[in-house]
Structure formats: structure tokens, C-alpha cells
């Protein structure tokens, strides 16, 4: 049980690395929590300081989830595996990867290194799930890109992709006989729900027609580059 605790703690601290905040401060000396949406995530980094910090934040946030689920959960061995990790009839090693990934997502949303003011966890969750089921996540990312290109709303793209993931898992498992662990479907559904809840203010702005859109897919200058800070 101590090994499981260590995995969760390491994953939380890994997730707590505030990629958007630190990249924005390092490259531009700007605390993005004071500007834009005030969210400490990659999208706000793009919006406030431009593509360089935003791209770096995206890679860091994705990597946190990938490393937690794909590396931390594998390097620190648990022997024997607690029977409770076979929840939902799933492979306990897959469930362990999911728990480690969730630890990183929680760290991203409530980072100890940034006064517990984090992002919404979409990129970190994507990294976690890519480590565990890369083909499903590749399809999900294609859905994200398609919605983004057609709507120009990052929030709508994130919400759609979150709902698409468990749907794709179900279709692949039950429709095409893919050997996908059932825990992916359960966790995917719970994660989709949490991401939708985290975006409730965005949903309200989408309904009101006041949500910010991407004006151009050229490398973003951000508010800083446009002299708006």
C-alpha cells in the first residue's frame, strides 16, 4: 500500500509543475494568472503571451500525464497488486496507470507549486490516456482538431474530445472487438464528466455567444505581442 501512496504522491507533484505559468514567466516575465481568463493553463498562455510559451506549456502538460501513467506507474512496482485495483474487472496495471494519471491531473488543477491555482487538466488527461491507449487517443485528438478547425473554440473542442473518448472506447471494444480494458471506459466516462464540469463557465459563455474564439491559426502573438498588457 505504501508503494501505491508513493506513486500517487509522485504523480501529484509531477502534475503540479505549472508549465503555463513557468514558461510565461521565464520567456516573458508575465504571470498569466493576472491576465486573460486568469486560468493557469496552456490556452491562456497562448492567449496572453503567445505561441512560444503556449506550445511549451502544452508539451509540459501533456508530458506530465504521459509520464505519470506510462512511467511512474511502471517503474515503482507494487507486489502484490491490491485486489481493489481490479475494480470494474479491469487489468490492475491499467487501473494503476489511470490512478497515477489522475494524480497528475489533480496536481495540474491544484498545483502545490502555484498556490493551488491550476488549469483544467485537459492536456494532462490527454497525455495520461495516450500512454494507455494511443490509438483511441489519436482518434480523439483528431476529433479535437476537427472541432477546433470548424468552430475555432478551444473550450468546445476540449469538451467534445472529452465526451468522444469513452464513446470511441465503447465503439472499439463492443463494435470492433478491440482488446480494451473495461476500466478505460469507466474512467473515461468519469473524466469526461469532470472536464465538462470544469468547463461550465465556458459552456455558459458558449450559450451566451461571448466565448473567445481563435481569430487566426497563424502563430499567436498573444496580448503581450499586440501591446495589450
Curated annotation (Swiss-Prot):
It is found in: Cell inner membrane. Its main location: membrane. Pathway: Lipid metabolism; phospholipid metabolism. It is an enzyme of class 2 (transferase). GO terms for cellular component: plasma membrane. It comes from the Bacteria. This is Glycerol-3-phosphate acyltransferase.
Amino acid at each position: 500500500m505504501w508503494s501505491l501512496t508513493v506513486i500517487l504522491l509522485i504523480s501529484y507533484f509531477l502534475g503540479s509543475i505549472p508549465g503555463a505559468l513557468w514558461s510565461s514567466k521565464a520567456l516573458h516575465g508575465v504571470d498569466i494568472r493576472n491576465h486573460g481568463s486568469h486560468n493557469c493553463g496552456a490556452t491562456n498562455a497562448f492567449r496572453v503571451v503567445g505561441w512560444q510559451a503556449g506550445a511549451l506549456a502544452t508539451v509540459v502538460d501533456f508530458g506530465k500525464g504521459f509520464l505519470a501513467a506510462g512511467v511512474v506507474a511502471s517503474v515503482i512496482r507494487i507486489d502484490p497488486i491490491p485486489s481493489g485495483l481490479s475494480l470494474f474487472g479491469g487489468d490492475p496495471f491499467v487501473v494503476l496507470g489511470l490512478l497515477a494519471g489522475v494524480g497528475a491531473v489533480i496536481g495540474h488543477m491544484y498545483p502545490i507549486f502555484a498556490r493551488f491555482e491550476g488549469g483544467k487538466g485537459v492536456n494532462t488527461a490527454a497525455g495520461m490516456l495516450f500512454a494507455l491507449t494511443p490509438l483511441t487517443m489519436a482518434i480523439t485528438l483528431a476529433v479535437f482538431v476537427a472541432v477546433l478547425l470548424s468552430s475555432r473554440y478551444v473550450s468546445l473542442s476540449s469538451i467534445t474530445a472529452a465526451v468522444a473518448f469513452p464513446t470511441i472506447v465503447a465503439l472499439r471494444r463492443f463494435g470492433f472487438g478491440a482488446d480494451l480494458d473495461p476500466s478505460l471506459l469507466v474512467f473515461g466516462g468519469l473524466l469526461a464528466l469532470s472536464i465538462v464540469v470544469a468547463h461550465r463557465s465556458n459552456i455558459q459563455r458558449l450559450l451566451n455567444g461571448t466565448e473567445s474564439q481563435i481569430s487566426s491559426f497563424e502563430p499567436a502573438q498573444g496580448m503581450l505581442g499586440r501591446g495589450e498588457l
